[in-house]
């Protein structure tokens, strides 16, 4: 496979992440509405420039009804990227729409964004630059290094936390309303050794993930396989659907760089 082929594969995977994210917002319009948790009427008050001279322009784009239209544009762009075939101009335009939408989402609200949103922006942005300058190899290197940095940062931050080191983090997360699941909570709450093992496994995997870039095929495949299973389990237990696609979208870049 060529660098272009790996880049297109990254595009298709990140497009699925974008499509899932857009659909999650579109099926819950109240969340982004004026009375929702991510209300623009409240979010625009977080920064003075959002209500200053640029306020009218932002209102025209980020008000609830127009924001839904923007989400639909992003969804259509994601579908274009998923479709078979490598049409340079349509795919470049679609990537630009995805990146612009991700940036507008960051402007609209300072809250509610997670690592998947950031990874979508990083991957799509890197691929867009690669498209514009016909430079897929630097784009793939950028994405692979960003993935290694993201995993390592998450792992080292957990390592520094006594809550994670003690094993209390897993029962704590599984008991929450947003990310929790009753059966998973009971499983780790009643078996402290399993909770500690789970926390240690996550810390070890995330902290050592940059080793996937060293060029050792067995190690790279082991870490990518572990990452795949890790994100599948998170999607099933914590409903982190976008995380799976956003982070797995970096794996073709890692394969290109390391193998």
Go through each PLM region and give its residues.
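Alpha-helical membrane-anchoring segments
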Residues: 1-259
């Amino acid at each position: 496979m060529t660098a272009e082929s790996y880049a297109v594969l990254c595009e298709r995977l990140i497009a699925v992440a974008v499509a899932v994210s857009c659909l999650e917002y579109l099926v819950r319009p109240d969340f982004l509405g004026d009375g929702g948790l991510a209300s623009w009427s409240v979010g625009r008050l977080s920064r003075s420039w959002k209500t200053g001279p640029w306020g009218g322009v932002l209102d025209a784009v980020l008000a609830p009804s127009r924001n839904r239209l923007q989400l639909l544009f992003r969804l259509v762009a994601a579908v274009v990227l998923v479709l078979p075939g490598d049409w340079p101009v349509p795919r470049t335009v679609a990537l630009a729409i995805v990146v612009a939408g991700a940036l507008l989402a960051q402007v609209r609200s300072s809250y509610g964004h997670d690592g998947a949103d950031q990874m979508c922006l990083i991957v799509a942005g890197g691929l867009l630059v690669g498209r514009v300058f016909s430079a897929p190899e630097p784009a793939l290197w950028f994405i692979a290094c960003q993935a290694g940095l993201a995993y390592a940062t998450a792992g080292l931050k957990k390592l520094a936390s006594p809550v994670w080191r003690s094993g209390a983090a897993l029962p704590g997360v599984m008991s929450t309303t947003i990310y929790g699941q009753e059966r998973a909570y009971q499983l780790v709450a009643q078996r402290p050794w399993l909770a500690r093992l789970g926390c240690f496994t996550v810390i070890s995997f995330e902290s050592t993930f940059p080793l996937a870039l060293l060029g050792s095929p067995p190690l790279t495949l082991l870490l990518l396989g572990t990452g795949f299973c890790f994100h599948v389990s998170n999607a099933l237990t914590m409903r982190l659907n976008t995380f799976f696609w956003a982070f797995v979208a970096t794996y073709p870049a890692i394969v290109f760089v390391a193998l």
